[in-house]
């Protein structure tokens, strides 16, 4: 009886762990030429962090040999769109009236 109860509780706890996802939304940023940025050092590295900062987010890393940026929205995936959305230079991008 105790073994059956233990197994039931163990299975329930295991299933609840599967239903809770820790996946962080993000995207692969695109370069000027419409390509994903390649990276050689998997995991956290300075190159991908710089790429992600240029696209308007603070954190990124090398995943599947491409830079992955956490919380990168669809509107900022393209380099020029991200530049326009985050550039503070009023001469390049005058404020809309």
Swiss-Prot record:
What are the protein's UniProt keywords?
A: Disulfide bond, G-protein coupled receptor impairing toxin, Ion channel impairing toxin, Neurotoxin, Potassium channel impairing toxin, Secreted, Signal, Toxin, Voltage-gated potassium channel impairing toxin, Voltage-gated sodium channel impairing toxin
Q: Which InterPro entries match?
A: LCN-type_CS_alpha_beta_dom, Scorpion_toxin-like_sf, Scorpion_toxinL/defensin
Supply the Pfam families for this chain: Toxin_3
Q: Chief localization class? A: secreted
Extract one GO molecular function annotation from the record: potassium channel regulator activity
Q: Which domain of life is it from?
A: Eukaryota
> Signal sequence: where?
1-21
Q: Where in the cell is it found?
A: Secreted
Does the record's keyword annotation contain NAD?
A: no
What the entry lists under Gene3D superfamilies is as follows: Knottin, scorpion toxin-like (3.30.30.10)
Q: Which tissues show it?
A: Expressed by the venom gland.
The disulfide bonds in this chain are 39-62, 48-67, 52-69
Function field: The heterodimer non-edited LVP1 induces lipolysis in rat adipocytes. Induction of lipolysis by LVP1 appears to be mediated through the beta-2 adrenergic receptor pathway (ADRB2). The edited BmKBTx-like, similar to beta-toxins, may modulate voltage-gated sodium channels (Nav) and may block voltage-gated potassium channels (Kv).
Give the family per the record.
Belongs to the long (3 C-C) scorpion toxin superfamily.
Task: Tell me how this protein assembles.
Answer: Monomer (edited version) and heterodimer (non-edited version) of this alpha chain and a beta chain (AC P0CI43).
The record's domain comment reads: Has the structural arrangement of an alpha-helix connected to antiparallel beta-sheets by disulfide bonds (CS-alpha/beta).
The protein, known as: Lipolysis-activating peptide 1-alpha chain
């Amino acid at each position: 009886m105790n073994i059956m109860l233990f197994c039931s509780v163990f299975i329930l706890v295991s299933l609840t762990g599967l239903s809770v996802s820790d996946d962080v939304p993000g995207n692969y940023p695109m370069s000027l030429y419409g390509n994903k940025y390649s990276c050689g050092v998997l995991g956290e590295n300075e190159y991908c962090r710089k790429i992600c900062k240029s696209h308007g987010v603070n954190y990124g890393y090398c995943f599947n040999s491409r830079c992955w940026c956490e919380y990168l929205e669809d509107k900022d995936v393209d380099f020029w769109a991200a530049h326009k959305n985050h550039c503070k230079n009023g001469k390049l991008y005058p404020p809309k009236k």
